Amino acid sequence: AMKFLLREYKFLLRTVKKINFNILEWIKFFINYPRVQLFSKYHIAHHKINEADLTLCSTNSWKEQLEKQGFNTKKTKVIGTPVYDDLFKKTKGIEFNNKKSKKIKILFCVGGMHEHGLWSKKTEHELIKSTINKLIEYKDFQISFKIHPVTVSMDEYKKLIKENKWELKIYQKESFLELIKEYDVILTYIPSSIIHECILLRKPIVLLQVHNQSAIESEYNENVISVCKNLDDIFDDLNEAQNKKIDEIVKDELIEKLIGKFDGKCSERAANEILDIIK
């Protein structure tokens, strides 16, 4: 967790240098910003000290939160989430085959919670072990791990697999988009872009909510994604995910709430807003 924090602050320092803060502005920022973060009731501090000449928001809810903190509404623009523009282009016209195979192939996306200091390593590993041990009670599942390509140690999870004598594949650097073509259902407990991508691509997904510090965000709609709240029910939840009939209007409303527009034009909107302000 400390390494992650230091890396984030180094990035912040480089950013502050790039935008030409003078020494007094630099001191003021670094005295106030950590304090604001520490006492914020949000996971990201919404404070006037963060206001810029232009603030780009992914969703309307972000804009509303900032406006409540006194941000200038004229300087706050909603443009969507540019990181998904490339996904939109890659998946346009692609249909994913969600038909059941003889053995249900599960891609279990793990790791990241203790690395970011949100859980202890013991808590995260216990959840993983309990889940895998429950799944392997039945022979109808083929399970593989997918870990974060950067922030998670491959050696750590190889060791976990070896210690528990599991026969599992483990992926790290591989493209998630390519992997999910080979799997029937995605299983995870991590609050990450994986969840959003599954919703966008209409890929069956089950979110684990069996820990009292669950990572699942309240805005996830169970009419769109399946949630497992008890490992004894995980088989039913996996089956439900594969057979879920999703209302397109409900799905589109959830996408709008989570990431804004999914149209491949978020980067263009961001660039236009930046150009307008520097003219």
Segments and roles (model prediction):
Residues 83-160, 169:
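Conserved catalytic-core segment of nucleotide-activated headgroup transferases in glycan assembly
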Residues 25-28, 32-120, 246-252:
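A nucleotide-sugar donor-handling region in carbohydrate enzymes
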Residues 161-162, 190-262:
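Catalytic binding pocket for nucleotide-activated donors in carbohydrate/polymer assembly enzymes
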Residues 1-35:
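Conserved N-terminal ligand/cofactor-binding loop architecture of enzyme catalytic domains
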Residues 54, 105, 142, 184-185:
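Structural motif
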